[in-house]
Amino acid sequence: MKNIMILSGAGLSAPSGLKTFRDNDGLWEEYDVMEVCSATGFRKNPKKVLDFYDARRAQLQNVKPNHAHEKIAQLKEKWGKNLFVITQNVDDLLERAGCKDVVHLHGFLPELRCLKCEGIFNIGYEKFTDKQCPKCKSKDLRHNIVMFEEQAPAYATLYSLLHQTSLFISIGTSGAVLPVGQYASMCEKSILNIYEKDVNLERYFDKIYIEDIISAIDKIALDIENFMKDGNV
């Protein structure tokens, strides 16, 4: 059986009410992105960065998975190991929708990482304050998020899975961070979902949905069915 990859970005979680640093309102407007999302910013003012991620966890607690998260979870349940679910998002909305084995390329907001033993543990939506590593009891901790100027270890998993992928589906990402057009070119067939037209990106894909993911996801699910039957989308 052929393999499918769904790679998602901020456009997947935006309908749930989660803002990104590309939005001009909400949580991000109060911060300079490079001060709170870069390795340099963390070295200069770790408290400011950790407070920022506390605020993001609090925001995450107040939103819910949307129809697209739930549909992807259903697709993963149906296709199992033949569907790779990869996301640039750091939220837990796919998991809360019931999706298994999600690969988070840029880290996971509910988790902290121990700088002493490198252990990773989940704190849910709680604040960073007074936490200690359950493994080594160290309080030398940080958010488990890949910041600007840092390497993303999960990219190795992404590229390994891409070489096993026949149908590549890009959802809600502009290609500004990852070269999704290049990824599409590596696979037999490809589907793009974006909210606004982008001719430079669209030229790499076989099928394009320029619309909200909520309205596109059921069509994409049908495309997957067709691809698994006869190799077309």
Swiss-Prot record:
The entry marks the following residues as binding NAD(+), namely: 9-28, 88-91, 172-174, 200-202
Q: Does the keyword Plastid apply?
A: no
Q: How many cofactor units bind, and how?
A: Binds 1 zinc ion per subunit.
Q: Where does Zn(2+) bind?
A: C114, C117, C133, C136
* Residue sites binding substrate per the record: Y53, R56
Entry-linked Gene3D superfamilies:
SIR2/SIRT2 'Small Domain, TPP-binding domain
| Domain Deacetylase sirtuin-type residue range list | 1-230
Q: Which cofactor(s) are needed, names only?
A: Zn(2+)
Q: Which GO terms describe its molecular function?
A: histone deacetylase activity, NAD-dependent; metal ion binding; NAD+ binding; protein-malonyllysine demalonylase activity; protein-succinyllysine desuccinylase activity
Task: Please list the coiled coil stretches.
Answer: none
Question: According to the UniProt record, what class of enzyme is this?
Answer: transferase
**Enzymatic reactions:** N(6)-acetyl-L-lysyl-[protein] + NAD(+) + H2O = 2''-O-acetyl-ADP-D-ribose + nicotinamide + L-lysyl-[protein]; N(6)-succinyl-L-lysyl-[protein] + NAD(+) + H2O = 2''-O-succinyl-ADP-D-ribose + nicotinamide + L-lysyl-[protein]
| Cellular compartments per GO CC | cytoplasm
Task: Name any one Pfam family assigned in the record.
Answer: SIR2
Q: Which residue positions are annotated as catalytic?
A: H106 (proton acceptor)
Enzyme Commission number(s) from the entry: 2.3.1.286
Q: What is known of its domains?
A: 2 residues (Tyr-53 and Arg-56) present in a large hydrophobic pocket are probably involved in substrate specificity. They are important for desuccinylation activity, but dispensable for deacetylation activity.
Q: Which family does the UniProt entry place this protein in?
A: Belongs to the sirtuin family. Class III subfamily.
Q: Outline what the protein does.
A: NAD-dependent lysine deacetylase and desuccinylase that specifically removes acetyl and succinyl groups on target proteins. Modulates the activities of several proteins which are inactive in their acylated form.
PANTHER family, alphabetized:
NAD-DEPENDENT PROTEIN DEACYLASE, NAD-DEPENDENT PROTEIN DEACYLASE SIRTUIN-5, MITOCHONDRIAL-RELATED
Q: What is this protein called?
A: NAD-dependent protein deacylase
By which gene is this protein encoded? cobB
